Swiss-Prot record:
The RNAP catalytic core consists of 2 alpha, 1 beta, 1 beta' and 1 omega subunit. When a sigma factor is associated with the core the holoenzyme is formed, which can initiate transcription. Disulfide bonds: none annotated. One of its GO terms (molecular function) is ribonucleoside binding. Belongs to the RNA polymerase beta chain family. The keyword ATP-binding does not apply. This is DNA-directed RNA polymerase subunit beta. It is an enzyme of class 2 (transferase). It catalyses: RNA(n) + a ribonucleoside 5'-triphosphate = RNA(n+1) + diphosphate. The keyword Transferase applies. DNA-dependent RNA polymerase catalyzes the transcription of DNA into RNA using the four ribonucleoside triphosphates as substrates. GO terms for cellular component: DNA-directed RNA polymerase complex. HAMAP family: RNApol_bact_RpoB.
Amino acid sequence: MGQLTKKFGKIPVSLGIPHLLNLQVDSYVKFLQEGLAERKTDEGLEGVFRSVFPIEDFNRTASLEYVSYDIGEPKFDQAECISKGLTYEAPIRIKVRLVVYDVDDDSGNRTIRDIKEQDIYFGTLPLMTEKGTFIINGTERVIVNQLQRSPGIIFEHDSGKTHSSRKVLYSCRVIPMRGSWLDFDFDHKDILYVRIDRRRKMPATILFKAMGMTKTDILDYFYKKEFYRISADGRVFWEVQKDMFRKDSAFADIAGPDGTVFVKAGKPITKRAWRQICEAGLETIEVAADTLDGLFLADDVVNPATGEVLAEAADEVTPGVQERLREAGIDRLPILHTKGIDTSSSLRDTLVLDKTADKEAAQVEIYRRLRPSSPPTPEIAESFFDNLFRSADYYDLSPVGRYKLNQRLGLDQSLELRVLTDEDILTAIRVLLHLKDSHGPADDIDHLGNRRVRPVGELVENQYRIGLVRMERAIKERMSLQEVSTLMPHDLINPKPVAAVLKEFFGTSQLSQFMDQTNALSEVTHKRRLSALGPGGLTRERAGFEVRDVHTSHYGRICPIETPEGPNIGLIVSLTTYAKVNDYGFIETPYHVIRDTKMTGEVVYLDASREHGEVIAQANAPFDAEGKLADEYVTTRVKGDVLMSPREEVTLMDVSPSQMVSISAALIPFLEHDDANRALMGSNMQRQAVPLLQCEKPLVGTGMEGPVAQDSGACIIAEGPGIVRYADADRIIVSYENGLYPERGGVRAYDLQKFHKSNQNSCFGQKPTCHPGQIVAKGDILADGPGIEDGELALGKNLVVAFMPWCGYNFEDSILISERTVKEDTFTSVHIEEFEVVARDTKLGPEEITRDIPNVGEDMLRNLDGSGIIRIGANVKPDDILVGKITPKGETQLTPEEKLLRAIFGDKARDVKNTSLKVPPGIEGTVIEVKVFNRRSGEKDERARLIEEYELGRLDRKEQDHIRGLGDATRVKLMAVVEGKQIATTLAGKKKGEVIAEAGASVTAEMLADVPLKKLSGLFKNREVNEAVDALLESYDQQVQFISNIYESKRGKVTEGDDLPPGVIKMVKVYIAVKRKLSVGDKMAGRHGNKGVVSCILPAEDMPFFADGRPVDIVLNPLGVPSRMNIGQIMETHLGWAAKEMGRQLAEMLERNDPLKALRNEVKRAFDSPAIDSLVDSMDDEDFRASVAKLGRGIVTKTPVFDGAAEEEIWSWLVRANIDEDGKTVLYDGRTGERFHNRVTTGVMYMLKLHHLVDEKIHARSTGPYSLVTQQPLGGKAQFGGQRLGEMEVWALEAYGAAYLLQEFLTVKSDDVTGRVKMYEKIVKGDNFLEAGLPESFNVLVKELMSLGLDVTLHQEEGKKRPKRVGFMNAL
């Protein structure tokens, strides 16, 4: 029976949280397209193959075409790959076709001569586990999703920062998925330049000409024409065009045909007057005679008599030009409209600057700029230009890029068109010109509409394409070198380039990361992480403040809280709880649709661009009885701003208050009362919590604990309705009823992990929560994982906390904790260390793993078996031998004495040295597992044979359990068919002569309980029943055979030996479980960023205690709360205390055997929830008692973020629990028994132990390794280094006058080589005097000065007395 839980949330949850690993798993499934009847040809692996094939040779005499691919079964399962250090991968085979052509020399036509089709092994492909991870070389890795600038077009300006004039310069950039970038930008003179691939800039009109446009075409496209008439008397008239409104002042009165004056001379033309002028039908308006000066011609002006070009298009109309035109009798001039509100002459000015004449010249110029080294010809230049943006082989916008281009430029091109068209470029320039001339706003590059997620599938797809392109080059070369007609496809294809690229990506890429496996939460958050770093992304050094900052478009998509502290802040972020990534890679968040102030029940997922302009209400907006928005004005978000909008305008509404934060932040109760900085620390530190030996879920939770634990993959969850057939600590067997696993008869066996080492060395183990015979439904928890209780995350412990100072032991966030937590193993965790030893074949002979080690006493070998490997269960401490190993030594020159002994006692024993694997310092624990790996052809030692026998026995037991479970399930199915049916013959029992039923008897369940299934064949009178029974038995036999084959394959893998690296004879891995109890120096934290280090573990009797004698568990500093502003911890403390006390009171009522009716009423009063009332009423007495008994530890409460318990509710709970409303109480000093002066805030807080454990960090050194150059001790625990003495420490010692101590530190204990030797000699002789020499670092300095050309010599002055000798032991 589940635990009774009090939920404080008031907003109904109408939409479930999507599976937390969907992004990873779905992306890779889409990439593989495995098992699909018809694969999509433009995406995933299929799309990659189709984009590279067909491959033709240079003469077009042969073509290698791709047909299909097939992914096989992996050779080893996931557990075997982790154990043996292998990659979890599957073989991939491709079917290709080689077509050979005959080419006609004259016509160039091709005819098919030969076709060869072949299946080819194409290497392996790493597979994703169901948990969203990859197993590479035996370790679990995660491919982090990359957050990258989206392909498409973006318009920007420099905000006046580029040029000294502070002029705002506009630019635009077209970014493809693959191919050349195209940049257009203005300089301070308003000339428009283009850059291709960020090379040297050139006037943009060169690009237009290269596209085939003439000078006139360019002007006609970008400018409107206006016409001016010049009368014989020199007056100038402007022809009225309705769509060309002039704001100028009138030169003369503008009047209609009837004499009505619309605008008086000298007055500006208004829009109203312009409308009247157009309606009156005026054809021309007189303008000033000098109006034409400085304008530009729209067309070439030709002398009608002679055909001579008097002025060219784009020429400026100067008085001289006007004179020439007047002489030729031309009275109507076409002029470029450059004086409008939002038009300028910038493109015309660019055209004048451009000296290229035509298309050919422009293409040659572009070729010269991009390929300055090679001389161009028109043909090469044209081909090169066409390949830049128009060829699908070299340029790919991708559907995303085309979608963004269409969206921004208002085009309606097909998403299949993935190259740039002339229309795209011209429209982009038109939009850019309009933006510049109207001083419009630039696009926001940090808006999530302009950033997209590249999930794992796309990242691997890109790597696969790189590998295939490399292979393509090799294939083309091979085709040209050899006679293709004699070749088969497998002669041409070599998959090694693809394998190398994949290996590099999964092994060393910045986005392929060692999985953070500290606990279930850290696994899930790592898979939901988005990184702006990585190839093609940003770098820490270049990323500015803007890209790291929280943006309004992040709402509901990216968590504003969870990000690392330090240099990566804001660059690595997390998806929010409800966020999804759509097919284009944009992050979407769900909303309820609101129509006519009513919620429609429809939910839409929108990306940041599509959300623009919607009026979005918060999830807590109240509704009235009719289901309409209750308030006249509602708090809404519109285009990122928070407004009060009329309820009629609301179009969407948030689905949940927790949709704006990530899962880590959603696990913090009362998040709304915490400062964001502390919430960031809180969400990060929960990921560092070590799973404890005894899990306990928080009394004050948020409701996110269940989804996180269940989606993490750490639990085992029922996949459908069924019955548990078998359950123990090692495995659970379930028979499912809904057609799952038909080949196994619906029976699935789950192996539970026991003492499994995680990536962070924490101990992962699963424990069953079900029992045999239990009926389960889909989603039920069958087994809990590490740090999980009842399918809910349980990373810490509920402790009774007091906020008070205690003798300075909680100064600066230090933590005082009760010794009871150590005695009861409250914060004890198990960590597993792996040690490996390898026996190699050396030049001097093979190394050997053996118990026979020279010069080692029997007491050191007592735990080793005959093979020299430690026994399981041995308790080991530092310097104990785990695996005995000897290595041959080189022959040494013998002394005469040794030669004499050799002559007397015969040949010496082999000259070997002891290279045994020993326990390193700081490790003390129990050996829990040993693995021995032998070469396939190698001899197995006794220990290897024992391990093999054990593994085979375990597999046999598993197979029998599995078949037994299948038999039980089949028996149930048979009973449904035969129950009540009559048997035709006597049914005999197992014992000789035993009769279970006579012929004609009706079958019952008891009758068939012990009868072997085979005996039921042909037993019944009814022929149809016999046929049904035979069909079931036949199916059972096939399923048994299927299961047997699986286990036979596993047995073969156990016995066949291992693939070891070259030169390795044998490898042994030893696993030691280390129990780490809580100790002084361990780091602990709450969920609100309240971290600290344990400063003192105090006996329980000395801890402050309540009036009834119960001591508190932990004492925290009250000064840690006000300045940090994380008040959530205080609210959690109060609510936790009330929950614990009320639970205790209810459990005491149960123990006192109070009447159940009174107890039921008390439970209802405590929970105060209609849902709990009906649940309590529906329970029988036994279930009710069990549920109340669980409340003894406290009532589990759920207070969701932004929708949690209000202060009034917490106060009312405190009052119900008979606690003072202010949450303070009187405490007594455990040492004196006296009451503390002030009442103290006490309660229950959930505390975590973090993986920064003092036992893993502390170490001590007497002597150890030294640096070669400086001769100073190395640093760090891994190098067994010394303690660094910095200048501040030197000052402190100087201040104390500890001169000899300081001299010792700076010389013999550091880098005085001769002084070290002398000191050792003196200690041995008992002559304890310090004689310091010259530090080696001084010699290094001298050598450095010499390297700079300075001659440095040392002189000792005569007559100087040496200092008096002082004993260095006395100086201490």
